[in-house]
Design a protein with these regions (language model features):
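Hydrophobic residues within well-ordered alpha-helices
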Residues: 15, 155, 162, 299-301
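Beta->alpha turn/N-cap motifs
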Residues: 30-34, 174-177, 293, 310-315, ...
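Mature extracytoplasmic/periplasmic domains
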Residues: 44, 312-325, 338-342, 358-359, ...
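Hinge/lid segment of periplasmic solute-binding proteins
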Residues: 32-97, 116-128, 212-216, 334-338, ...
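Glycine-centered hinge/linker elements that transmit conformational signals in sensory
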Residues: 154-159, 194-293, 338
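Glycine-rich, aromatic-lined ligand/substrate-binding cores of catalytic
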Residues: 259-264, 292-314, 366
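C-terminal capping/gating helix-and-loop segments adjacent to ligand/active sites or protein-protein/ligand interfaces
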Residues: 418-478
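Extracytoplasmic "Venus flytrap"/periplasmic binding protein-like
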Residues: 2-73, 108-109, 299, 306-307, ...
Length: 486
């Protein structure tokens, strides 16, 4: 086999150009965000049409993360994805996002750090004579539990605490809205029965989740179990009787406002809520334009960020620049789950919660449709995505194995003798996270204009969220209509 290395910065564009020519490579890397456009252009060979054997394409044995397989399915005829859509690549890895936090800052602030799953907290309290609540950050007791997701409010509380440490400019950095919108059942785009995609980032309709003490509820012909979010398609069919079994959650629009408020100056107006009130900024994060050409991990390593959201790929860098550094040392950082929408009663018990949510990235391996060595190419791909190839890749700590069993192996992936000790959080995140909005359609042209305005104007305190939608809603919907010829 001949391996040709390409610069990562131009890999996708260089590969797309090569695939459009007559002298194509045999095997290619394909990011999840490009698989739809490359399949639509006829660049890739379909893997599950019977030409290739020896792999569980339908993942019947659930050996591979389902979100790893499903993100490489796409039907060019209908411009949709689904379990019956053709498969164009196999996942080389999966990279969930989590919350990285500065554990040294917690110690400096006299905040106790514990690592106790919620179902073991009662036993922990009994054994230690404590009465800690099931919270990610319990400000009353000054305890941070890295095994329980913080609520939106707790993130703000802890971020403001961290900003009291000299050198910590911002307590929190998160450039993605996904954990906020998806946690309450919202999304930026929805496929409608009429055959078009609808821009729903500003949707003000309330969302619903099945109560934890409810066995199941059927709405509009769909059965939902306890803890499941009601889909956008079924939401309008919820009756007064159904609501007895459901908890109401914020709208996608209000969740988006919460995200944008992170970077807004404290007390400044971010926009109007769905009920007409002013949403005020928190001043705990930095906008993308302010970050400039630097990376979030650079600010984290320097101590300017107390917490930031990113993927497993940051681990080798942080091990080298923090765990092995004189300034920080081992145990100076760790990881925790992404925040989740939660409401509490007066005693600190959760009464309403959203779903754990977030995005993950993945790199796939595909066969060029123009290859004349397809069978040999597939044998190589099977090796890389198989047990032996995944073991070799995972020891570097860069990404999670595509195979579930390997990802839970102490030596191969968890590696709890090294930072981050709480690496099980990555495995748990891989179970529920999905691709970002860049994957939704064949390209990102419907995203680019409003996203640039969001990141470089709205999140820099130069415009409100309402101005964003006034300026870009109609043009974005027009672009979405073009994908299906609506």
């Amino acid at each position: 086999m001949k391996y040709v290395q390409k610069a990562s910065s131009s890999y996708s564009s260089d590969t797309a150009l090569a695939l459009s020519g007559n002298n194509t490579p045999d095997i290619i890397y394909v990011e999840d965000k490009h698989v739809k456009s490359w399949a639509d252009a006829g660049y890739l060979a379909q893997l599950d049409n019977g030409d290739f054997t020896g792999f569980d394409f339908e993942n019947k044995n659930s050996e591979v993360w389902e979100s790893g397989i499903s993100r490489y399915r796409f039907d060019p005829e209908t411009a949709t994805s689904g379990e019956d859509a053709p498969l164009w690549a196999l996942p080389k890895d999966i990279g969930p996002t989590v919350l990285f936090y500065n554990a040294a800052y917690l110690k400096e602030l006299n905040i106790e750090e514990i690592s106790v799953p919620e179902d073991k907290l009662a036993d922990y309290n009994t054994a230690n004579g404590t009465s800690y609540l099931a919270k990610g950050y319990d400000s009353a007791n000054r305890v941070f539990n890295n095994r329980i997701a913080m609520s939106w409010e707790q993130v703000i509380e802890l971020a403001k605490e961290m900003q009291k440490v000299e050198g910590c400019d911002y307590g929190y950095y998160n450039e993605w809205w996904y954990a906020y919108g998806w946690s309450v059942g919202g999304d930026v785009v929805q496929y409608m029965d009429e055959g078009y995609y609808k821009f729903t980032l500003n949707d003000t309709g309330k969302n619903y989740i099945v109560k934890d003490d409810t066995a199941a509820v059927t709405i509009n012909g769909t059965t939902y179990d306890a803890g499941e979010l009601i889909s956008y398609a079924d939401r309008d069919a919820v009756t007064a009787a159904d609501k007895e079994s459901l908890n109401e959650l914020p709208s996608m629009y209000d969740a988006f406002l919460e995200f944008v408020a992170l970077t807004a100056k404290e007390g400044s107006v971010v926009g109007k809520t769905s009920t007409g009130e002013d949403k005020l900024g928190y001043g705990v994060s930095m906008g993308a334009n302010s970050l400039g050409t630097a990376d979030a991990e650079d600010y984290f390593v320097s101590g300017k960020f107390g917490m930031f959201v990113d993927g497993r790929w940051e681990v080798p860098t942080l091990r080298e620049n923090m765990s092995e550094s004189e300034k920080w040392g081992e145990g100076s950082w760790n990881v925790a789950p992404l925040p989740v929408y939660k409401e509490y009663d007066a005693d600190g018990n959760v009464t309403v919660h959203g779903a754990a949510a977030g995005h993950s990235g993945s790199m796939g391996l595909a066969i060029a449709d123009g290859s004349d060595q397809k069978e040999a190419a597939f044998e190589f791909i099977k090796y890389v995505v198989g047990e032996e190839g995944q073991k070799a890749q995972s020891l570097a700590g860069f990404a999670i194995p595509n195979q579930i069993a390997l990802s839970k192996d102490e030596e191969i992936f968890l590696q709890t003798a090294k930072d981050p000790v709480n690496s099980i959080v990555f495995v748990e995140a891989a179970e529920y996270q999905r691709p970002g909005d860049w994957w939704s359609l064949t390209d990102s042209s419907w995203i680019d204009e409003w996203a640039n305005y969001l990141n470089y104007t709205v999140r820099e305190n130069k415009a409100t969220v309402n101005e964003l939608f006034e300026k870009y809603y109609d043009s974005t919907q027009e672009k979405l209509n073009q994908y299906t010829g609506y």
